[in-house]
């Protein structure tokens, strides 16, 4: 079972080449410079054409929880990975990162799905306490780095550090029409969709930790000042996701 998982539609879109009607593993279709991150020999490594998954031995992750996304600009990406990778290895925290500059450019391109764009590194904390501690430490480490906003998430403070609640493992449910979709588990054990939208979605059964309550409240209940930014306009529809 893959530890991280994909939006199925996004996964297909990432494997269709320009001017081609066929899906193809991107790693086979085009060679691009790879990102590198050294980990100890007792870490597990899984690789696909977009992501490299890195997991320390004897660390059991929950199926879901609060996860952290880091964004970057192309010129800083390898340096950011060097800094964060070394930090997470010392902490023995599971994470994944984009495998190459090619995958980085595709996920940040204008045709990429907005719900996944901007994500360069995904971090899987083992507990809520670990999650809150990692947010604060990463904010200190990455204060001089730059990256785009991850639309599905909330920014923690000023650094390119973002978070959302969602699945850590590959769980699927059917939507009633026979279509499979990514899922998370409710407290009663039933599955519900893990909504990956180009905006933040808080599952209705999730309690918000005190350490991020201010940021979550500000996103869910925007101030009047924020609403005034859109006052002269009527939003009809999106041109593109």
Predicted regions and their residues:
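Phosphate/pyrophosphate-binding loops and the adjoining catalytic core of nucleotide-dependent enzymes
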Residues: 2-241
């Amino acid at each position: 079972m893959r530890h991280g998982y994909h939006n199925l539609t996004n996964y297909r879109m990432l494997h269709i080449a320009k001017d081609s009607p066929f899906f193809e593993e991107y790693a086979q279709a085009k060679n691009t410079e790879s990102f590198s991150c050294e980990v100890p020999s007792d870490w597990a490594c899984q690789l696909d054409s977009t992501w490299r998954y890195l997991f320390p031995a004897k660390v059991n992750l929950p199926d879901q929880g609060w996860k952290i996304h880091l964004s970057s600009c192309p010129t800083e990406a390898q340096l950011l990975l060097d800094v964060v990778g070394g930090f997470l290895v010392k902490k023995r925290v599971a994470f994944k990162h984009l495998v190459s500059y090619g995958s980085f450019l595709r996920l940040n391109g204008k045709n990429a799905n907005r719900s996944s764009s901007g994500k360069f590194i995904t971090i899987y904390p083992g507990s809520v306490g670990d999650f809150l501690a990692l947010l604060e430490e990463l904010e200190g480490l990455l204060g001089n780095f730059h990256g785009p906003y991850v639309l599905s998430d909330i920014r923690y403070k000023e650094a390119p550090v973002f978070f959302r609640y969602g699945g850590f493992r590959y769980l699927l449910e059917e939507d009633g029409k026979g279509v499979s979709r990514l899922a998370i588990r409710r407290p009663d054990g039933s599955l519900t969709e893990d909504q990956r939208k180009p905006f933040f979605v808080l599952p209705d059964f999730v309690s918000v930790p005190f350490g991020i309550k201010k940021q979550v409240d500000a996103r869910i209940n925007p101030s009047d000042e924020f609403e005034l930014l859109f006052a002269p306009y009527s939003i009809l529809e999106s041109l593109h996701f």
